[in-house]
Amino acid sequence: MKPRILLLIATSGLALAQPDEPISDAPAPEPRELAPQDRPDAERLETPPANVSGAVLARLNAEFLTDDEQADLRVQHGQWTDEDLADPVRLANSLAIAHAWAHPALTEENAASAEQAKLSRAEAALNRGEAENAIDFTAESGLVRAHQIRGRAHELLGDTESAIAAYERASSFDAETPDEPEAVRAALALFRLRAPDNAEQANRALLERITRARDADRLNYNARLVEAELLYARHNLADAQAAAREALRLNPRAAGAWRLIGDIAVDSFDFDTAESIADQLDQLASTAREASVLAKAVSADAAALRARAALRRRDPDGAETALNPALGAYPDRHELRALDAAASAASYRVTSTERLLAEFDERSPGLPDALVWVGRTLAEARQYDLADGYLLRAIERAPNWSMPRLERGLMLVQAGRDRDARSELEQALALDPFDIRAQNSLKLVTELATYETIETEHFVVRYLDGIDAALAPEMAVALEAMHDRVCSDLPGGVDFEPATRTIIELMPNHEWFAVRIGGMPSIHTMAASTGPVIAIESPQEGPKFTVGPFDWKRVLQHEYTHTVNLARTRNRVIHWMTEANAVFNEDAPRDMRTWTLLANAYQNDGLFDLQEINTAFVRPEKPSDRALAYNQGAWMFAYIVERWGPEMPRTIMDLSAAGRSATEAFEQALGDTPESFLASFKPWARSQLTEQGLLLPEGTPSVPDLLAEALQALGADQDPDQIQDPGALPPEGLIDELLERFPDHAPLLEYKIAFALVNAEVRLTDEQLGLLVRMTELRPPDDAPHRRLARHYLAGDDFDERLRAIPHLEFLDAREINSPAYAAELAELYAKSDRPQRAQAKAERASSIAPFSATLREQAARYALLAGDLDAAERHLVALIIIEPDRPIHQRRLDALIRGQAG
């Protein structure tokens, strides 16, 4: 019944005419999370279908093929049967395709000894980290695949000279060989180990070889896969994914293609798809295993994917949990050991990290991979100085590999060291001119060098000269007020000042904002703090912008709280608390959607304790978990401030910065365990929900209980056929009777309002008005009655009647993030009621949310003049000249204002 009533309420009104944008009494659209620090909205990938292409099926069913030829082709295209795998060579090859590296057929001494089978065993040994065995298995083979495997084995052993020699032999084979994809892999590997005389020419030659390999056999999945690997190495994620999908259409069991798409999913923050692909890789790792040992199959690829995803979510414990079983099965696999070191670094265990790096070096001396992973992970955790040290060590080890230089360049961009970043990115591109991420980032820092700057005491605002010049000066002024608020010792204040000016970069469109934050134009939020730098997308309308106008002051105050918190704690802060602090410092009332989310969690025993809330951020079990963690965190922050005082959150975060876990910090500061904190929080939470009308007072029966009682009484007096269907709307008369008994029962009042507003006119009756006003008293955060009341009063013929909309518009405006409509209407009402200062304040807010609206700028200038604020009027006229340079009226008005001031 409840959804039906809400639908009646939601659809009971029409929009109000407003300048620029209408006010609606329909429910507000769900607001975008202001600053998802660790997971910008994911670029969702579709899990590839596991069916083979029609062309492959036609090849497999060709009548001229012998049985053995058909069986070989079935293995080549991932369509093998149990009967096919009775042959030891086909079994070995199928296991290599599926990356089932630990299968007995690839590990036991008496396994198949045919050349191709031995090469599959060599590849398996290589992927288990057994480089010497891989070399032994390939000793008698002169095939391209053998040379390529030997090259990587020597690389893992730290024998760069032998690795180069093996890769050269593999890549020198004629392009007509069926093993051309392996030759391309070898040529690609050479880029890591030595600098070509002409990098651009060498890259083009590599692309030509891939094209030839693809053209030589259109159904060779390996040709598509190596193409995907090259594109992925160049950070061309879209084309890499397309090529990997093509490979899967030619061989649905190609674990290498699945793994690559999984890596792209992690890079795109699409952790659901990454997990789905990890499950697929787990299944492939069980290829040809007996049912009794299926549970023992461990996929190294799946473990690496899950660990990578956990590290991106800043969940080092989750990464280690994912890695441990795989490290048990593959203790020498270099990738797993590198990720293990990265997970240790993400937990700030310096001694452990160095030990793991030393163990990695014992197995693979001179290999830079672990250093790159550690540096990259620390950079994402905003530990820029530590990251720099590891990445410099990686560059020293692999001066010809572009990856460490690229990662360092990207880290320097995030740290705001643009000059150093530019130098590093230029060197990365000299080694690999086709890397898209490096190209994007270098283009960014080159463009940033041309930006205009405004310096204040605590900030440097950078912006592209043009239309953003209308906003940047206002932003600079507002930021200093934010500094005073955020750095204060007031509730929510961090009581700390960063040592250097914070750089605010006003990015001219979403694409450049995304490149600024992540090096690729595929991040879906509008502001983010990297610590010393806050990037924010210009709040403009159009296809190049994600959200259009938004309350950038609120957003920046949120982000600056992150920046100051990170500075105070040296970037070591309890995840949920820094988010909670940032939301608290938005200084905006909690809206109805948030209250409803919290109430549902409370009623369903779904509130998180201190351990669960961090897990909900990094490993959400339900789609709503992260939103709940975000909002419950801010709620708990308010509770801590109210109960222990404004200093307590800072004490807890300082303990975290000193190395305490979240649980330890709370126990030391508050004397609370996760369980006892939640136990003490819940009564406070209930009192808040009751106060806000989201929960009924203790002892008050719910609507279902009241209706059940009424229906039971009805059934005692009437025939069963006359008893109303419990799923139908109750009679209005029954609701009236119940409201007489329980006049403060907000859910009952919802029913009454729904009945009263069916077919209601824009102008309401006194009875309808009384019901809506009563709802504002019983359920203070509910925006629906305020929307309906505002529409009613604004439709009045009498001006004094229209003025009665003001408190309802103020309520709505205080909770609005994206629309200037409420503030603009309030400005008009205040101006016409001779309250010029209030009119100016609301016109300023409207023009702040939509700073490029000429209509709102004109309104703001007009009311600034009305309030006698000539400086503000001049500022808006200057902005109008920038926004509408083809309208000379703005310049004439500005000239007149200046003359008037001079006179």
Q: What do these predicted regions represent?
A:
Residues 20-75, 79-100, 123, 277-280, ...:
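Beta/coil-rich, acidic/histidine-enriched accessory regions frequently appended to metallopeptidases
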Residues 116-123, 145-152, 180-189, 222-226, ...:
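Alpha-solenoid helical repeat scaffolds
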Residues 204, 208-212, 242-243, 284, ...:
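Juxtacatalytic substrate-recognition/specificity segment
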